[in-house]
């Protein structure tokens, strides 16, 4: 019984393996493709009438001689025109050391079909691609996805805010303020509701935190284009800062003091804008960019946090 089981396993493995004749047929079908991508069914050397070890000078002379005979300006025969196209293609392949080396390798190793094909397309189409065009295309694609992502996140945040009780209560209060507390069931009432909701939506867009409104100026593509301007602006700002506060020892302007305070507290710009003026002034007056003041402020915040517990 064990012998029967072994025979069965052997027959299954033989059935799973592809027949040798099929593999041989596939290889024989693919091998001509390796050479055909260069000069189709012809041999590039035979088209120019030179040997495979011919030097560049001999190849140029052969091409010049054949062009005098088969060039469309010299010979109007349609068949001669077709032949000249093949001759010109063969010359383009053999005059360049790189493509000629790849062609010689394809002749010597016709079984490496996929490698030879990849080498051919890399040589003929890779160098024709302008890196600047690739970079611009890549930036456009990335910027498009970036904008869609920003728009999706912002729209989702707006819809989430609209479902909150605070938004609905504010909407009712604004409607009450507009209508004077008079409820109307006329046709224009729905239009009034839409206008009120639109006004409130604009207010929500200004006050929403955590998600910024989509902007073309924040896209990577736009930032890349404006990179020289941005670098110049930063360098100019740093120079002015150094000159004003390091050399001349002037007191900090209000905007610069706000900037130092915001950087010390690690507060994003949009969050800082939403802080009321009284709290801003209170924070700026503490001069938190100075180490001792910052340590004192942190200690006060910790005490306040413990007291509230």
UniProtKB/Swiss-Prot annotation:
Cellular localisation: Endoplasmic reticulum membrane
Taxonomy, superkingdom: Eukaryota
Glycosylated residues (UniProt): 55
GO biological process per UniProt: protein folding
InterPro entries listed in its UniProt record: DnaJ_domain (IPR001623), DnaJ_domain_CS (IPR018253), DNAJC25-like (IPR044632), J_dom_sf (IPR036869)
Topology Lumenal: residue spans: 37-130, 243-309
Segment forming the signal sequence: 1-36
Matching SUPFAM superfamilies: Chaperone J-domain (SSF46565)
Membrane-spanning ranges: 131-151, 220-242
Membrane association type: Multi-pass membrane protein
Cellular compartments per GO CC: endoplasmic reticulum membrane
Domain J: 43-107
Gene3D superfamilies referenced in this protein's UniProt entry, alphabetically: DnaJ domain
UniProt keywords, alphabetically: Chaperone, Endoplasmic reticulum, Glycoprotein, Membrane, Signal, Transmembrane, Transmembrane helix
Intervals, Cytoplasmic compartment: 152-219
Keyword Nucleotide-binding on entry: no
Pfam families membership: DnaJ (PF00226)
Function: May play a role in protein folding in the endoplasmic reticulum.
PANTHER family: DNAJ HOMOLOG SUBFAMILY C MEMBER 25
Protein's UniProt name: DnaJ protein ERDJ7
Organism encoding this protein: Oryza sativa subsp. japonica (Rice)
Gene that specifies this protein: ERDJ7
